Amino acid sequence: MITAQDIKAAAKRMGADIVGIGSIDRWSTAPIQMDPKQIMPNAKSVIALGFRVLRGSLRGIEEGTYFSNYSAMGYGGITYLYMPMTVINLSKMIEDAGYEAVPMGHQSDWRAIDGVGYLRENYSRPVAPGKAAPDVMISMRIAGFLCGLGEIGYSKMLLTPEFGPRLRVGIIITELELEPDPIMEPGTLCNRCMACVRECPGGCIPADRTVKANVGGYDLEWADVDMNRCDWVFQGGAEVAEGEKGDYFDGKSEAWAGKYKPSDINPFYKAPRNLYNTGKAICGAKGCTRACMISLEKRGLLTNKFERPFRTSKPWKVDWESEAIEVDYTASYEGMDSPNTKKSKSETD
């Protein structure tokens, strides 16, 4: 018989950083479109696997010089390459023992609800009374909470004692009954410092508007995050003034064409292409992840510690109203021998 300890040890060998287990009864208050039993009626346990987003993958955005790394290596690469392999291989181990396992490495683009939480109009229909409309979507953050990985912070992000908000979560729904982990008491990490509110570049996290929900017997409350606004702020867009035309998303989104320009936390004239399907985080999760992480590290609450603080200088901003900074140096090694290359004093002596 496979035990919870066997599962956790195997998951970490396969690449997970943290692992938690929740009994299926903890989802008794889940909306039907987010209920694991809609996928596996005989489910007994949910296993949540946490994969750290490297602090270094945020460094380039913090410095304003290397934006693709977070979307590629810290977000998309984990979500679409690294995490699925671990989730699939752990599911194989469970099924080899005779218990069915549903691997879920990320949210499906086929889900019936949109990014805000409403059913998509004329998208899919239940196949029988009492069943959810396909596809069901399990909230990975809620799963992390119910499996004991961490708590839901004011920003709606899952916060863990190891990495704070720097985490991606995959889950396995299984009919294997496992010993569950205790749920973290809300307020253990998040003290409502509102750093996420202050630093969100689009004001998407309101200080005075919240959502309340009973999750696993706990009364939780988090910000009523404006997910529609976050969608274009996250990608580096800013609304244009009345009568002004913006072309930042032109050629990328017909619905957004002409409506947005680059924001002051974005150095790109036009929206770069996606990396790994959804990777386009120009804002670098400035409020919900970076500001929160900085706050938690300053308070000494995270076990993943570093020799130096993350932020060592004043955050930069792009002034799009001013003249562009002139680039008067060689852009590549190939140009270093050109006649226009500036030479050092030692080379000209």
Language-model features, listed with the residues they occupy:
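Residue-level signal for secondary-structure boundary sites
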Residues: 55-57, 180, 300
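Catalytic cores of enzyme domains
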Residues: 30, 72, 76-294, 309-312
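Short alpha-helix boundary/capping motifs
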Residues: 39-40, 122-123, 316-321
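Non-catalytic, usually N-terminal nucleic-acid engagement modules in DNA/RNA processing proteins
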Residues: 1-88
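Short conserved micro-motifs at the rims of enzyme active sites and ligand-binding pockets
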Residues: 58-60, 237-246, 302-305, 348-349
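C-terminal/domain-terminus segments
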Residues: 298-328
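Extended, amphipathic alpha-helical scaffolds
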Residues: 333-349
